[in-house]
Structures are given as C-alpha cells and as structure tokens.
A protein has these predicted regions:
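Transmembrane alpha-helical cores of Major Facilitator Superfamily
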Residues: 11-15, 85, 115-123
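C-terminal transmembrane helical hairpin of 12-TM major facilitator-type secondary transporters
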Residues: 41-97
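Paired intracellular helix-loop junctions of major facilitator superfamily
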Residues: 33-34, 101-111
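Multi-pass alpha-helical transporter architecture, strongest
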Residues: 60-64, 150-184
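Loop-to-transmembrane helix entry/capping segments in MFS-fold secondary transporters
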Residues: 3-4, 107-117
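A membrane-interface helix-boundary motif in multi-pass transporters
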Residues: 4, 38-44, 134-153
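Transmembrane alpha-helices of Major Facilitator/SLC transporters
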Residues: 6-33, 49, 53-55, 124-128
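Interfacial helix-cap and linker-helix signal at transmembrane-aqueous boundaries
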Residues: 27-28, 32, 131-141
Length: 184
C-alpha cells in the first residue's frame, strides 16, 4: 500500500466522526423535545457511543485474528476501515452523553469538572499505551487480544456503570443559591 493511500485511510474514521457529529446534536434535541427525559437522552447517547464502538472493535478483532498477514486483501482492509469508521462515527454520541453531564450537574463548575475528568482520562490513556505494549508482548503479537478486545471490554463496562447510576438531574448551583449547599 502506498503512503498516499494509507494517509487517506487513516483520515476516514475521523471524517466519520465529523459527519456523525453533525447529526448527533439535532437528534438529541429532537428526542428531548419529543418527550424523552434529558437523563434518558444522555444514557442513550452514551450507550450508542460505547456499545457501538465495542461491537465494531470486537468485529475488527475477529477479522484481524482470522486473517493471517499474508492473506490480507483489499477486501480485508476495506472491512477493517469500515468497521473502524463506524465505531469512530458512533463515538460522536459522547458529545450529547458524557460530555454534557458536567453542564447538567453544575453550569458554574462544569469547566473545572470537565478538566478534571479529562485529566484523569489522559492519565488512563497514557497507561493504556504501556499496557497495550505489555499485552502485545505476552500474547505473541496479537493485536486483537492486546488492543481491540480490551478497549471493547472497558467500553461495555463503562456503559454498564453509566447506565446503573441514578442520574436524576440535580442543579447544584440552584441549591447553593438557595443556601442549602455551602460553597467550598
């Protein structure tokens, strides 16, 4: 494969994210306007984001594991890139799921909360690089077991945790303004 072709292929998942982002917010707004609670819109969005990604990455893992390197064809590459693009595209739903939760909880402190959670995510991301390399070495170079399936596993677990929490909206700023909550 030439460098120009691989460059084009590497941008496809991100283009899918941009395309889906144009659909996500209006769809979430229509769901809420149609009577779905904001909490349920957030949960649906996050479920689409994480479980969609988990399904796509599991399928990529299956294709990668069932295709020896010498048997990779153009169809194999197209299949993997399609699955990755769909998974990345579904990841755009995080913009009306998890990323909005901070604003729902406290508009006043949303930027601090988002910064804190993003910092923790960056630490986890840094550690994941180490663990991917470690798993890659102990699995004999198996990308499915060292990268795709662990990510899919954590996406499913994260979805379950997100769904289990009672997320009745609480406006902490309003409670603080009423004097029922002391400022730190």
């Amino acid at each position: 494969m030439s460098l120009s072709k691989s460059s084009f292929l590497s941008i496809l998942p991100y283009l899918a994210t941009v395309g889906m982002t144009l659909i996500v917010a209006p769809t979430a707004a229509k769901l809420e306007a149609g009577g779905m609670t904001r909490t349920n819109v957030r949960k649906l969005s996050q479920t689409l984001c994480f479980t969609g990604g988990a399904v796509c990455l599991s399928a990529v893992a299956f294709v990668v594991n069932s295709t020896p390197p010498e048997a990779v064809t153009q169809t194999t590459v197209i299949t993997i890139m399609t699955l990755l693009s769909i998974g990345f595209g579904l990841g755009a739903w995080v913009r009306t799921g998890l990323f909005c939760g901070h604003q729902d909880i406290s508009p006043k402190y949303a930027s601090i909360m988002l910064g804190t959670t993003n910092t923790l995510a960056a630490v986890a991301s840094t550690l994941s690089t180490f663990f991917t390399g470690y798993f890659f070495s102990i699995t004999g170079g198996n990308w499915a077991l060292s990268l795709f399936l662990p990510i899919a596993f954590f996406q499913v677990v994260s979805t379950l945790i997100f769904m289990m929490w009672d997320s009745t909206p609480v406006d902490f700023d309003a409670i603080q303004a009423e004097g029922k909550l002391k400022a730190a």
